[in-house]
Amino acid sequence: MTEFDYDELGLVAGLEIHQQLDTATKLFCACPTTRREPAEADRTFTRYLHPTRSELGEIDEAALEESRVEREFEYLAYDTTCLVEEDDEPPHRLDEDALAAALEIGHLLGMDAVDRAHVMRKVVIDGSNTGGFQRSTMVAEGGAIDTSEGPVGIEDLMLEEESAQRIEDREDGVLYSLDRLGIPLVEIGTKPDISSPAQAREAAERIGMLLRSTGKVKRGLGTIRQDVNVSIADGARVEMKGVQSLDDIDDLVREEVRRQVELLDIVDELDARDAAVGKPRDVTDVFADTESGVIRGALDDGGEVHAVPLHGFDGLVGRELQADRRLGTEFSDHATRHGAGGIFHTDELPAYGVTAAEVAALRDAVGAGEDDAVAIVADDPETAAQSIQAVAERAETAMAGVPEETRGANDDGTSKYLRPLPGAARMYPETDVPPVDPDPSAVETPELLTEKVERYQADFDLDAGLAEQVAYGRRWQLFEQQVEAGVDATLAAQTLESTVTELRRDDVPVGRLTDAHFRGVLGLVADGDLAQEGVPELLAALAEQPGSDPAVLAEELGLGSAAEDEVREAVVGVVERNSDQVAAEGMGAFSALMGECMGALRGKADGDLVSEVLREEIQQRS
């Protein structure tokens, strides 16, 4: 991947971090924040959403474009959701626990709490909110975090309700689940102080660490999302939404910089060619006898083929902007927003069953010369007309520069067009929820995870890697409780982190293990009733039989700690079976026999004891 001189390009970037809070109930109702499976839904309903005007009488451009594609939104409701999520009951008062958690997060970011928090409605008509808006309130502003490339300012901290979970995209709409809708969410927006991809990732990691330090945020896939705003000099601000992994942020910034650089180069080339976009038209007759599967299928279903001539665009529609994404892909993104399956263009034709003769006839039909390109859409008449018009408009933009827009992050670091950038016209007051006066004086400062790592190393003599695993893990409180109860710190840490990870890799259902299971197992080791080596086997058995008592199950499995005479008997048996090897190698046979001894004892004996006895028996025979 090309690495640019970001200072020379004038890279400016900012982050929006969206993190679910781990509260018992949702932000504006008493429903639990428990996630559900779609199959558990007990009812469904549908909605059609349309944009509304802001308090200034304006309609947001992003919402307006969304409304041009009429779609049916179906929602899955559960016995753990209510009429508030369905927008059939007014919202309740703002959840106090969520507000307290948000204030604590703001404190860690060095922010100033607002004197009064007013709830607003943010227009969102993509179906992810049943009422066509998301409730949001500013809790704090100002603040900063440190990075190795300088400080990054924090603009604002919003407390919001999470959107509904997108379950299935359909031809005429989307299926959503209400279990996620209304979960409290904080949105942290940085100032545009980020000047490199590496700094963007570092800033996100720092904010993520601060969030997890509170112990009041949800963990797991989908509970945190990052949006990245990127622009370069002469380019435009582009918002990329839905980055799930911190590992993707720097690649995403690099690819967006590359995209904007390529688009600016295309602007210069089009200007030099005196390019122009022609008028879209129906070219169905050109393909009356086509054998192209896509086009033939559309025509057989009563569809049409529409085309737009792109004068001076020859060779540029196929120009790569990002990895495996071209200017033509950008055109296609806009066409698919209006229901088309995609586009064909002459930079890639003849292909896909379209013949050279059909390409020549197409050029003649729209008046395109050798230096021109042509894009086509084959679909039902209305979709084809709307989609090719969208392509024409995006081509016009390509001659002017980089468009401001919202894009969706792809897994490979590239992005795709979603909609225009939203503006202030999407906000208006929520009159059903009274304002609240935050009290920052009650906020306590939690220990940062980085500080916890250092303490674990100093107080418990854990190595840096293990200390970090425990501190950043889900069971650090259990770890501290067990150490206080007398369990060896290294054993407790390895059991709660390393052993669980190994069992998960072996497809053991470790999600069934509870704190009580771990307390029971570690207690058996501390009392001398279970060898450390038997811990993995007992935990695996408990995961399969979560209702079992650890002590009883250990006895059933024969994992009770072996006495020294039992250990010696097992070791002597191994040594005598391998007497020739012992006679020939002496202590050189130790490693091979140690493994056999541990296998014979099946985890019932501590490794140090087995090692000591084995050394004695080998030395006696050497």
Swiss-Prot record:
The keyword Cytoplasm does not apply. Allows the formation of correctly charged Gln-tRNA(Gln) through the transamidation of misacylated Glu-tRNA(Gln) in organisms which lack glutaminyl-tRNA synthetase. The reaction takes place in the presence of glutamine and ATP through an activated gamma-phospho-Glu-tRNA(Gln). The GatDE system is specific for glutamate and does not act on aspartate. It catalyses: L-glutamyl-tRNA(Gln) + L-glutamine + ATP + H2O = L-glutaminyl-tRNA(Gln) + L-glutamate + ADP + phosphate + H(+). NCBIfam families: gatE_arch (TIGR00134), PRK04028.1 (NF003107). This is Glutamyl-tRNA(Gln) amidotransferase subunit E. PROSITE patterns: GATB. GO terms for molecular function: aminoacyl-tRNA ligase activity; ATP binding; glutaminyl-tRNA synthase (glutamine-hydrolyzing) activity. Belongs to the GatB/GatE family. GatE subfamily. One of its GO terms (biological process) is translation. The gene is gatE. It comes from Halobacterium salinarum (strain ATCC 700922 / JCM 11081 / NRC-1) (Halobacterium halobium).
